[in-house]
Amino acid sequence: MQIKYLFILMLLFIGNNPDEEVMSWSETKKLTWKDFKAEPNQKSDAVALTASGITFGFSIKTSDKRVVGFSTTVESHFYPNKSWYFKEKCSDLILRHEQLHFDITELYARKFREKISKLQANRNIKKQLNGLHASINNELNKTQKRYDEETDHSINEAAQNHWENFIAKELMKLEQFKSK
């Protein structure tokens, strides 16, 4: 039986659940199995589930019915109470695989921030921001799926190593847009 690992991308907006425990992405703090606090899904073929996503919010400043400015928040979050694993089936390699799902989420948060930085206030800014958000999430979902397919959910260790190197390089390219 092929063991599968499951990744869930949670697309949350700021304010959905202020009591939800979240961990912001950090260069220095990597995930540990202790961060996966949900009860495992006994019916799942997966041995681990990482719940992470991009949290996005914005405000628009107007004057005399004209848009004169806007501000945004874009965060890469991990949700411990929605993430789980089967202790007896997991390894350091699987944890690396799960960490990279979170790193990929951070990469797309950086891409989102970069694209936002190129926008200027205008009457269509809300539509532009929402369109960018949808586009980034679509790209993120495709990349997460490709990552799982190419690594065979971490079973292909050579592919796992390739992806780790690739994502590290991509994160470096967008260093100025990293989560703070």
Regions found by a protein language model. Give the residues of each.
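Residue-level marker of positions within ordered structural domains that often coincide
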Residues: F7, N81, K145
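Active-site His/Glu-centered metal-binding helix of metallohydrolases
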Residues: L95-I104
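Active-site scaffold of zinc-dependent metalloenzymes
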Residues: R66-C90
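Bacterial Sec-dependent N-terminal signal peptides
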Residues: M1-M23
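Membrane-interfacial alpha-helical segments at the cytosolic side of multi-pass membrane proteins
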Residues: L107-I116
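Short alpha-helical functional segments enriched in proximate histidine and acidic residues
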Residues: F102, K115, T143
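Short, well-structured alpha-helical interface segments that form or flank functional binding sites
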Residues: C90, D103, L107
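Metalloprotease/metallohydrolase-associated module, dominated by Zn2+-dependent proteases
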Residues: E20-V68, F78, Q120-K180
